[in-house]
Amino acid sequence: MLKTVKISANSKTGPIAVTYRSGEHETYGTCPTSCSLHPKSETGTSQIDSEYLAAVFDSVPRGGQAWTYSHFAAEALPLPQPNKTVINASCDTTAEAVRAVELGRPAVYAAPLESADQWPRKIHGVTFAQCPAELADNFNCQQCGGGRPLCARGARDFVVVFVAHGTGKKKVGTDAAGGCYAASGPVAIQWHKTRTTGAPNDAAALRAFVRGLPYGSFLRHHIAGDCGLELGAA
């Protein structure tokens, strides 16, 4: 199920196009079960939706930029290509992030709350730098990188760090299940609503949505959700 928004009101993304993706039966139905931020109460999936992933990869606004994040294994994600969506491997450990970079995938790292003052730093020769929107008020994705958001740069040799935020932030980097920032608050409201009101053919809906975006638009796929195939989906 897919929810599309032409102009987001989210302060961190800024007024850009965004999407939310959920399962039909479970909000976390498109997210990998292996994700350490996944709540125990949600099942998730172990399978990528290949048709939808292809749609995401292709869905870049004309003259614009698109990016997203996935908690599926880095090697299962497409390598960056010109004029395609940049799909960042979302990693739970610095070791995973370094490996993703070695595999040629752009990577981001969900860092524990107590690490906020540790960035930037190098780990095994790879630079880890915190998301600029976390370091300054009134700064967002639209302004990032002088028109080239860091997360929209596929061929990069550094990892973007997102320090834990949201009500479950203290769980990130621990053995406790959960920690997903989208588990509560305004993001959760929109995400849960996607399950009941979103477009059922999400691949087709996404392609149609992108065709209608203005030239030069920025698109962040999946404020919440992932590229998985919900268990039991046709």
Tell me the role of every PLM-derived stretch.
Residues M1-A234:
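Class I S-adenosyl-L-methionine
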